């Protein structure tokens, strides 16, 4: 406990433990579900949290809560993160600590950029303490951790301050490689070293696949660890990041100036640059392979409930019952304006927008709005430059499934490929078959007589 006495005898006390206890208490309340006023659903996993904490840590949630009217019963579904990644992000918000698997470092950085969490977004410019395995028994631990402490003050100064190197200068890692083998303790120095996360640190991960990561306007190469790379341990390894509980100055961080990145943030908030993976069966796109595999099971799953009228199969009895309405012609939902009837209530709701001209699905990268969510998704793909629908004949890609279908009908359909000679040949074959049938009929008539 420290205290200061000014000339006016005003005593000020600083409780150094308050911030730690404050976060600890908040986290305990979250884990017990106490005073939680928001639920976040990620991949069917529900996370309870406090809106004030989410908004304080993430500019994404801050903007989202301002745009949406939410209360204690509100549930927000996020479809651009894995549940395990979001769980670690949430733990970071409440504990200032985060553990990341090496193969997920790039994904965590991308998540930090999307959610507007500066510490996670700046992992590529942070400094990490490399903790080596314990070799006291001649064997390494099952894991070693890279411990990252958040730099304090200006970002430029943070890159040069508090860098402690282990070993002689000649033994330090080069700009091209960083050895994962722990340093020897015979020199009497600590087995922990702090390194700048620049290109050398990123190359420590090794790579067969290199992709670009945007770090406040500068592109660096980020690489994923190949399985054959030996970094000092044959067992799975993890990265542990600790965010110091330092006072955050009210200054604009490079790359997040309000004027320059407002549109960029809107793009990240509602239509970020994640690469989309398309289902080969129906063309629906997903942000990660896990969701795609889950969706593909819908195409390959058993469909024991078969419609007797059209033989179409369904996975559940409820889906079959809903389908049967098509054959019965039963349309219980009628439009009050024009009287048109529909089988399903959602279809009626879509139709009513024709009369009201309501466009509830707005693009947050421009001012355009749409009546249907599917139209908005097609529009957002154009912003992101995504073309997940690929023609199987010529490999040309399209942003909309309808564009692909139109292309296939116009360029690769059978009627387009039929040449005049083929038509003539087919006509001659039909004529020959007709003449043969007529001759055969005449022979049968003669035989009967």
UniProtKB/Swiss-Prot annotation:
GO terms (BP aspect): cardiac septum development; coronary vasculature development; heart valve development; kidney development; negative regulation of DNA-templated transcription; negative regulation of transcription by RNA polymerase II
Span list, region Disordered: 156-194, 405-424
Ranges of compositional bias, category Acidic residues: 157-178
InterPro entries, A to Z: BTB/POZ_dom, SKP1/BTB/POZ_sf, Znf_C2H2_sf, Znf_C2H2_type, ZnFinger_BTB_dom_contain
Composition-biased stretches (Basic and acidic residues): 405-417
Motif (Nuclear localization signal): 50-66
Any GO MF annotation of the entry: sequence-specific DNA binding
Domain text: The BTB/POZ domain seems to direct the protein to discrete regions in the nucleus.
Name of the protein: Zinc finger and BTB domain-containing protein 14
